Amino acid sequence: MEKYIVTGMSCAACQTRVEKAVSKLPGVDNCAVSLLTNTMGVDGSASSAEIIKAVEDAGYGAKLQVADEEDAQSAIQSGVNESILEDHETPVLKKRLISSLGFLLVLMYVSMGHMMWGFPLPGFMDGNHVAMGIVQMLLSGIIMVINQKFFVSGFKSLIHGAPNMDTLVALGSGASFAWSSYVLLAMTGAQLAGDTAQVEAYMHEFYFESAAMIVTLITVGKMLEARSKGKTTDALKGIMKLAPKTAILFENGEEKEVPIEQVKIGDIFVVKPGASIPVDGFVEEGESSVDESALTGESIPVDKTAGDQVSAATVNQAGYIKCRATRVGKDTTLSKIISMVSDAAATKAPIAKIADKVSGVFVPAVIAISLVTMAIWLLVGRELGFALARGIAVLVISCPCALGLATPVSIMVGNGVGARNGILFKTAVSLEETGKAQYVVLDKTGTITEGNPKVKDIVVADGFDEERLIKIAGSLEKYSEHPLAKAVTDYVQGKGVDLSSSELTGFAAVAGNGLKGKLGEIELAGGNRDFIEKYADINEDFANRIDQLSKEGKTALYFCENGRLAGVIAVADPIKEESAQAIKELDNMGIEVVMLTGDNQLVAESIAKQAGIKNVIAGVKPDGKEEVISNLKKRGKVVMVGDGINDAPALTRADMGIAIGAGTDIAIDAADVVLMNSKLSDVSAAIRLSRATLRNIHENLFWAFIYNVIGIPLAAGAWIHLTGWTMNPMFGALAMSLSSFCVVSNALRLNLFDVHSASKDKKIKFNNTNDFIEEESEMKKKMEIEGMMCGHCEATVKKALEEVDGVKSADVNHKKGVAVVKLSKEVSDDILKKAVEDKEYVVKSVESKLF
């Protein structure tokens, strides 16, 4: 996505105009304009020159966000150009406002002070109404020149056929000035004719103060809005300021301070107590505790020793450490966070489309309503001055800005709150949609559990000893990247077993099943029970012993040598301390929690019981996880939470994917939301924040719509006959100036929202059905069978299988040569195979499968 800075936008109508102009270009796939940050993100093959020309043809200005050498270097280091977030608008508006108020006070003194309160006037004006009118015209004209931006932008947009908020202000103020100037000319004629009564009558037809007050009050509102908008990006600006500007490199035995841009991958840098870590890396020497709250929101310092990872912008609290740089510039964790938050602000939430559609026709509709209002009052016999006042009031009270800001300000603040708490939403869509979750599907390892499994039991088969078993296991597992493999290799190395000579040939990893390879002439295999049963026999007594370990939540890894079972290594991964509470919070929100794991049913049920999860789908291979998510999506909104490579397809397939921050880069890339902490409680926090943000957007949209629905008829004088109410255009301008300020202020309330407080959680009722989950939770095996020729064969095989202890049912299809067996407990492949082959059919294969 290329990013551009857009200038000249003043309201939602401008935003819509720019989006339409760029979206029409050939090669533009997507265009999102942010009125909040005055930026535009464009996807596609269109050139930057074409895009900039399209924006300029629409009446606005544009330039690439990284446009010069200095900005480019800054962007490389931080991942985003910080200058675009600086508040350049408020100082300019402040100067305009001070100048306008100075002249406005004099104007109000002249126009109202003498008449209402008897304030003295200069001699040349006392009793000279024409002189008073000329002074008012000059003062009003000066104020309008000071605020000429409204007129330049407004009439320019009108000429381009895309009127905006500035057009409404310019028409309202300009009409007041033009009418008053006409009255002044008429008054001059009356005075020359000696018609004193007519001169007195004309004196009450002046609207010079309204013309000046309108632009001044709108400037007040614009300044309040600009200051509030600046606060919405405080979180992002705060993160940017965390980036250290220098680093201390250790070269040739000496310390040397250099600009952060000069640090390269592989450099050794030192971090002293109290200093910020400059780039990502790992500790080579020393020990310390590091405050990572800037990235994760977690206030408790983390102990670091040799080999541990450190991240840029975290603070070294205690020891002196030497580190080696692994990621610098835009690749650091900090830069990625900044980029994610910035990119999210540049995207558009689906709910914003409502406001966009209205904004596209809002200003032309208001101008039409204003003209109709004037025409109606003239037709019913009211004087031109009264009709004009009603038409001007309609123009200046209408506010498309409130509509345009309703969604993006809430998205920006919500993203900032998330970033401060270690919850990163990649897009506005993910921030809006996460809170709509009906099902939260959790991977087991590293998500519910700590992801740091340890060997707990060694069960040796007959004819083998423990040393031989763990050498077989270590020889295989050292080639695997699975978390369980690391647990085994750590255990083997801890026992002092030398694996340097254990070089395998023909090594292969079968996803979701196991490993195999040859050590010289010896064939080795390791994995789950179904996998090992293809290579070795497992007697029933041994299997029962292992089932008991599985019921305790331990994962059994079987190993065999040359077709003989060598034994089992049982590995346990304890659940995270906060997992049970996190799942309880999700349940209290009305969300169905599902555990989805490749582990066997007994282990999965044990972990689920500890965590308080009612729905378990076990024995699922990596490709099967994606299939489960697809089926579950037919029943409601699905959020998938995972941390591993195997979870990436499921994360992508889900309505929303949430990656645990300590997980793999692949999982993080596939996800829509990233949790910088590895705490499961942050899942409920993300959903809670999403719901709060969406609620805030609804409040903003309601205010923006209801304000215009009530305000425009009031300004038009629709209620005069019922209530006698009329609205002075000045009060209309005041209301307009405050409307956007109210919307932005409401969005800023999100900064006070506690994402971890479950006290106000509401249990949203969904029509969730658990039939699918219960069906998928059953253990199933698929058997390919040869020799079945007819319905009688089907019935024979079905009866044989259903007589096996542990088989709930068997669905047999002789045409496909397949039997699907549903189990109530673990049943070995050999037992099922024997039951069928005793009936003189041939079993080609047996496998656990998800359907």
Where are these regions (language model features)?
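Conserved ATP-binding TGD loop and adjacent catalytic N/P-domain core of P-type ATPases
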Residues: T347, A437, L519-E521, G553-T555, ...
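Membrane-embedded alpha-helical bundles of multi-pass transporters
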Residues: M116-V130, I159, A178, V417, ...
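Juxtamembrane coupling segments of multi-pass membrane pumps/enzymes
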Residues: T196-A197, A212-P273, K304, I354, ...
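Conserved cytosolic catalytic loops of P-type ATPases
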Residues: P26-D43, S48, E205-F206, K237-D331, ...
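ATP-driven catalytic headpiece of P-type ATPases
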Residues: K95, T314, Q438-E481, A511-V594, ...
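Conserved catalytic phosphorylation-site environment of P-type ATPases
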Residues: L295, I354, A389, A402-L476, ...
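Flexible metal-binding regulatory segments at protein termini and peripheral loops
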Residues: M1-G133, K229, E254-E257, S339-T347, ...
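Transmembrane helix-loop-helix hairpins at the membrane interface
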Residues: V92-T246, K357, I458, G724-P729, ...
